[in-house]
Amino acid sequence: MAAEVQMVLYEDDSVQVQYIDGSRLQLSPCGSEFLFEKAPPVSAHPLQQPERIRQRTHFVISAYREQLQRALDFRNSFATCPFLSESIIPSEMKTRILIDVSEVRWPSLDTGDGMTYMQSGTVRISSLDGHAYLCLPKSQHEFTVHFLCKVSQKPDSSIEVSEKNNKGKKDKQVEKAGKICTRGSLSGQRLKNKENELYHQIMKSEEPSEKSCVNGAKGREVLSSPHPKDTCIYTWVKQCWSVASCPEEWKYPLSLALHFHDKISSMSGIDADITQKRMLTSDVSEERGKEVSVLPRALLLSCPAPHLHRWNFSDSLSQKQFGEEEYSYHELVKVVWYKGVTYRLTHKHMNSIEIYPGDGSVFKSEGAYLGNYFTYYSIREESEEREEKTYAVNNLPPDRPGSPFSVCSLIKQATRILQHCAKMRLSLSHNYRVCCWKMVPGINDSSVLPLLLRESFVPGVGRFLAYSDDKVHAIFLDGITLTLNWNFGSFIEKRQVNRGLTLGWCKLTFPDGQNQLIQIQHPRPYERYVTTVISWCRRLTQISQQEIPIHPSSSVPEESWSVASELEKIQKFNLLLESSGVLNQTSNKKNKQSLDRCKPKSSETLLKEVNEKSVSVALKKTSEILQDIDNLLSNSKW
């Protein structure tokens, strides 16, 4: 069986795996279906299509079971909702429990129960019921969580009936478990059961373990064997997350781990980076008091919307090397595993990436538009001192002999991933793709069609459109279209926020249909297009909230501030003055009072309204508008 070279997890939790022999495996977003594409033989014709096998995950044959299991393990480690097929999980990894484990309770911050400091410097926080625990290494850049999760179920009504039948027995089991828990304290004790033996192998801990209240789980497993119909099958799921982007359900135990690690460091006298810890704990310090975490639930065995599955087929005519080809799936990338190195991305307000070479160190993208600089964080084993280095993408150092990894190749690979995500964020389709497992009732799906916030047409320049998904489209008269991301949070949140650009890239579409991704800082020959759109966006964010339609009923061109509308106002004002003779009548007012009395009633009303003060104010506004026009022309360099 061929080994994996690259595994990619996308934002919709779909997976693509590339093997060393050229074969590929694709996993649907829900995990219930997969497509295996065999590598074509050497003697195959260039136009010959490779052999493809498409199967349900629950009914996978033995030829692809091991490969599919590793792909699912990779998916479940980083996905929002795991997919756990009972037919693929090994028997030693299954646990039968009578109660429904849907949430866990963590210890209080004031007590030291369930908190363990291991010899490797890792802090482990265990839940009071023993159904979950969190591990934070001494680097404090990422953490792992282990929790019990019920295997994927069939979408039928029999599950609801079985849950109702188990409701009465659940209370009795909880009562028994509570009595067992009162016999011992979790403080300074370790777990000891079948699952915890696996924990000790992973953590390589040499500390002696003692029995605790969680031993009741082992008793429940024995008790449940005579009544298999009344039990639920669970398995342990391991997930890895970044401290900088912690999910909501793990924020409280992470705050406990960070607090406990700081306490141990202060007692041992280890110098720590206080500034970095404050940055990491800024989002989790407010989680005190949220001791209960709702555990993620596994997806159903069968997909509710299999018609939404999309498969990408490789092109046999263009054989590219691994890691150098573009990602064929039109979706944002969440995690990439490439030759032992993990790349983790976040897409909240801007694209950022973290590189984990596997030795405990990490690279983080930095800079005004993330991706121009990378900061390297590591801890020396001898002195346990933190080391930080900053690398510029345009000036990477050469490879050093004997180094465990190439800094140049890692950062270049990360830059390619960021560029792919920039293309997807500037695409017109990725926000509108409907994910299959998000169609299940009860799961929030916030992906809706964007609303048109503002549309302006400038004669001689083009049309500008701003949407609620932070996209800006500019269609110039010469046929070139520019697309960029601009944060219009003030439109929806009813507050003035001028965060500006969320990407350091913009996309140009030429009249022949070709696209080009260019850096906004260095637009080169396309500077006039970029500066014109950015000026329009900056002016748009300065408009007051009262003038911004949150839900426009129609896409009527808005020209309240544009140059064309101001010029049109000036022309109308001059025409009004010329037709009514206001200037002549005002200058000769003292000499021609008799003629003024002969004017029609409408002219008398106009004379009273338009006096010398109003004319001076209008001229002052006209001069300001002309200055704005000059500044716009000088900046755009037409």
UniProtKB/Swiss-Prot annotation:
Superkingdom is Eukaryota
Pfam families assigned:
C5orf34-like_N (PF15025), C5orf34_2nd (PF22833), C5orf34_C (PF15016), Polo_box_4 (PF22834)
Give the intrachain disulfide bonds. none
Protein name from the UniProt record: Uncharacterized protein C5orf34 homolog
Q: Which organism is it from?
A: Bos taurus
Instruction: Output the lineage of the source organism.
Output: Eukaryota, Metazoa, Chordata, Craniata, Vertebrata
